[in-house]
Structure formats: structure tokens, C-alpha cells
């Protein structure tokens, strides 16, 4: 017996009159007066369910088929036939229906056949992938993830696994989750009245990582081109639609590369993954265009054919000041541009993706390369129409004396990153990279309004269920 994914049947990959078995779950059941039941069966392999036409001649028709409700799992065997109805080209003429699992109480099943609010679905995150919308998000998320790995592999990059537990604060923001095995009811203290981390598991204070960048730099300075792709954590008490406490980051790092090289890599990567999702998940994107954001497809198509605009931060500030627009947040040199500023540049002024370069040093991290003017660093943000910042990156400071000066200016304990300073002592090279928040990318592609709906189990302030 041939087991076939629903997508293979609906796409015509299997020949008409082939006998196959489809395994999945009931989306709906409709009974006709002619003694035939129509089962809509999905298995997650594509957006659309397949229709199985079940005659009442089957032995278990009365006892089992007529008791099938939304969510029941089945194995249906039958012949692939051309569908006379609109909506799909093929359906299954069932010769056997095997009930694998029933829904205990259809009346209380949380995913009963009705339209649920996206807020409600967050409360039942363990069941929400069964819905059309979250199932589509999951497939798009997978497609983007695979495309990212494929892109870097084709470009000659090596994937490296950055540690999740670290003693370093890459961004210097201090918003980190502490990792400890100390007994919170009996915390050991030093004579100075401080927590004695020497008694802790690692013998020092440790945290969940906010970025794999510093670790990636060590491997880029040996393998030339590397990238990390994994979870990162921020203990930022922001209960908004744009923030998560746990999220995934894509962080490439390239030796012998300057800021322009990083900007070109970012453009090439985004266009590659957007082309991939347009080709591979068209069915899901059509759903998002119909239900979530009517521009879900057109803006991706425009993105991949657009030339990226380039602008210095100083010039971008001048553009905003000369716009005549009244912004909620005032515009002046030295600010960290807000989303409204970023979107104005991308959507109204340039009408294209924009790379903003050379930011004031005071709003950027210690590791970014100081420019000759002494006021700005070789940093960049990629701004996308419809969302604003989607990528942030920089050329790293490869000169030890400049790095040490920045470390001192920002009050960072250099002893914690002595290993990072070693990279500048032993065969230092210019190198650059960037970070892409993966969930931000998924929200952009799908048009979903809340970042908590594009990751399977969102972690946020006072929310760590499942």
C-alpha cells in the first residue's frame, strides 16, 4: 500500500486511478441524502485538505464514519480521481476508512469547526497548529529556515553552534536571564555580602545568551565565513506585539569583509529566501494575502526585484527633518531611530528597502568599528517597507587599542572578554556581520501582526506555558 502526503495527491504528482492511503485529521464531514459522506482531510503537508468521498456501503459507515468530527484522526484508502467540483483537481474515492483516534467530546474540543480569535489560539498553543492560520505560519517558518541554511551552504559558509550559556553580555544592555543552580532559599554569600557564584555550577555568574555573535567571530577568524542560527534570550520586560523573551537569530560573520560586504550579503540573503518562499509556499502566501495582509505576495515580489537604497545615518536624519512630517518622536542627530522614522524612509522616501549606515557611536555596541570622524561607527540597519528594521549589523573593531578604548568608555569589565581581545592580538583581520531576528522575518512574510503568533511556544513576560 502506498502512503501519500495530501500535497502529492492534490498537486497531481500521483497518477489518476492510483490506489493510495492518506493519513491525517478530519477538518470537516458533510453527509448527503444520497448516502455519501464527504470528508475533508488534512495532514499539514499543504494548505488545502483533500476531499475523500465515502459511500455508505463501507462496513463501518454507520458505526464509525458518521461519528467522525473535526479533529478525529483517520487513514483513508481509495483511488485518486479527478474532482468534478470546483476548488481542487483531485479527490479520493474511498474504499476503506480506518478510524485511528476519536475526539472524546466534540462539544468541548477547543479546535471545533469555528473561527477562533488569534488571542484565543495563544491560550491553546499546543492545539493551535491544527488551525489553517498557524499551520500556514509553521510551513512558511520551515521554508524560510531551510532557505537560510541553503543560502549559506551555497555561499560557502560553515554553520557553527554558538553556546546558549555564556558569561558575556554581547550588547552591553544587561537584560539577561541568569543561569544558576544555587538554592534560592539559601543563597551563599561572600564576606562582602554579595552572592558567592564560586559555589554555583560554573563557578561564576552565567546567563542565557543574547547573541551568538562574539562566538561566531572566533570561528570566522579561522574558517573565514560562518553563521549561527539558534535561540537567543532577552530579559526585556516589554509586553508588546514586537518582543519575545526567547527568539531565534541568524548571525553570519565574514573575515576580511567590510561594512559594504555585510550589506551586500544581507541583500542577497533576503532576496534568496523571499524567492524561495514565493516558489515553495505559494498556497500559504495566498491565504495570508486573502485573510491577513493583501500585500503579502506583492510586497515580497517587489522586494526581490528592488535595488536597495543606501544612505548615511546623518543624511537620513536630514531627510526626516526636511520631510515636513510631524513624527511622534522628535528627530535629531544622535537618536536611535524609531519604527515610524524607519518606515517613512523605506515606504515613503525611498519606496524600497534601505541600508542606513554609519550610526553615532553612543547608540551602538562596543564592538563596532570606529570611523575616522571619531563620532560614528561602521554600523548598518536594513529597513524594509512595511516593518522597518529587519537586520542590524556592523564591521567589527579589529584594532585592539580602539576596542579597549570603547570597552573602557562603556564601563565593561574587560576581564570577562579577554578571549575576545585575543582575536585582535593574534592575526587580527577586518571582519563584519549582522543579525537577523528570525521571527521578525516570519512576521514580515506572513503579515501576522503579533510576533507571538509566528513561534510555536512564545515566551514573554509572565508567559511561559507549555
From Swiss-Prot:
The protein's Enzyme Commission number: 6.1.1.22
CDD domains the UniProt entry points to: AsxRS_core, EcAsnRS_like_N
Keywords: Aminoacyl-tRNA synthetase, ATP-binding, Cytoplasm, Ligase, Nucleotide-binding, Protein biosynthesis
Catalytic activity: tRNA(Asn) + L-asparagine + ATP = L-asparaginyl-tRNA(Asn) + AMP + diphosphate + H(+)
Domain of life per record: Bacteria
Keyword Disulfide bond: no
Entry keyword annotation includes Signal: no
Main localization of the protein described in the UniProt heading: cytoplasm
Subcellular location: Cytoplasm
InterPro entries membership: Aa-tRNA-synt_II, aa-tRNA-synth_II, aa-tRNA-synth_II/BPL/LPL, Asn-tRNA-ligase, Asp/Asn-tRNA-synth_IIb, NA-bd_OB-fold, NA-bd_OB_tRNA
One GO cellular component term noted in the UniProt record for this chain: cytoplasm
Disulfide bridges in this chain: none
GO molecular function: asparagine-tRNA ligase activity; ATP binding; nucleic acid binding
Biological process, per Gene Ontology: asparaginyl-tRNA aminoacylation
Xref: Gene3D superfamilies: Bira Bifunctional Protein, Domain 2, Nucleic acid-binding proteins
Stored Pfam families: tRNA-synt_2, tRNA_anti-codon
Entry similarity comment: Belongs to the class-II aminoacyl-tRNA synthetase family.
NCBIfam families associated with the record: asnS, PRK03932.1
Assembly with partners or alone: Homodimer.
Protein name, entry field: Asparagine--tRNA ligase
